[in-house]
């Protein structure tokens, strides 16, 4: 399973790290991620601003994740 995690803070790092521990998850795409997520196995950072909803939609369409987890409040409020 591919998972998309939106955000770049400590909360999103913890979520992505835990998701990556599942044997069902083969890749976690983190947008934008941080230096810590860049070092984790099975995690891949993508430089997309969490407030740029059209870019996030393009990323989701390109990556086709089976699950998306939104960490920060800004993209939740933006839709």
Where are these regions (language model features)?
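ATP-binding N-terminal substructure of ATP-dependent carboxylate-amine bond-forming enzymes
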Residues: 1-79
